Every structure is written in C-alpha cells, then in structure tokens.
C-alpha cells in the first residue's frame, strides 16, 4: 500500500508540474468508490468497507490540512462488522466542487435528496 501511495503522489506531483501556470485553474479530486474494513480477512487482505479518503489538489484548494476527523479503531468506534466511520460524506466535497469551481448551484439535481453542506475545502473563482 505504501508503494502505491508513493506512486500516486509522484503521479499527481508530475501532473501538477506539467500544468505550469495553468495549475491554479484546475481542481483535481481523487477518491475511491469504496473504503476498506479495519480488520484483516481470511485471505490476509481487507474487505470493502465504508470509510475511505479523498485528496484535493489545485489553486483553489484550502490546503495543508486534513478535512475530516479520526474516530479511531477501537471496537466501539467502528461501524457494523468493522467498518471505519464516515466523518465527511463525499457528496459534501463534490457539492463544493460543483458550487465553487463549476459555478453550478443545482445540487438538488446532482445529489437528489441529499442536503449538501460545503465544508470549506475550496475557495471560489476561476
């Protein structure tokens, strides 16, 4: 996993470097469609779970911080059969991208039935 994260970081850094002055006009979001359970399974891996992570990069990202909280790995802090707790819904992050970077306020059409709450990860602007 550490090697894969290093590869991702190096790839994102190269992408950012290649953009030169245009990097400030771009917002990059990396995310997974699933998280991983905290406990190892019978195959020495981990099953799909709830909690995951997202990375944001770009000129309008309020950087240098972690945008969620860490509830911990104790049994009483896990959800169900060993899932990490979700502390920031991915739709809130993507809703903020829609609002502040795409200038699209139609969040009720993009995320039907979800009351999106921007979390202050981005500044507005082109």
PLM regions with names:
Residues 1-126:
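Feature marks hydrolase-like catalytic cores characterized by long aromatic- and Gly/Pro-rich stretches
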């Amino acid at each position: 996993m550490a090697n894969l994260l290093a590869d991702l970081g190096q790839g994102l850094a190269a992408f950012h470097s290649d953009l030169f002055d245009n990097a400030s006009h771009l917002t990059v979001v990396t995310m997974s469609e699933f998280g991983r359970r905290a406990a190892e399974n019978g195959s020495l891996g981990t099953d799909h779970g709830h909690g995951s992570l997202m990375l944001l990069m770009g000129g309008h990202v309020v950087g240098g911080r972690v945008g969620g909280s860490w509830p911990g790995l104790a049994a009483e802090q896990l959800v169900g059969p060993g899932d990490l707790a979700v502390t920031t819904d991915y739709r809130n992050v993507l809703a903020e991208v829609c609002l502040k970077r795409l200038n699209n306020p139609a969040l009720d059409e993009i995320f039907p039935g979800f009351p999106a709450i921007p979390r202050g990860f981005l500044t507005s602007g082109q």
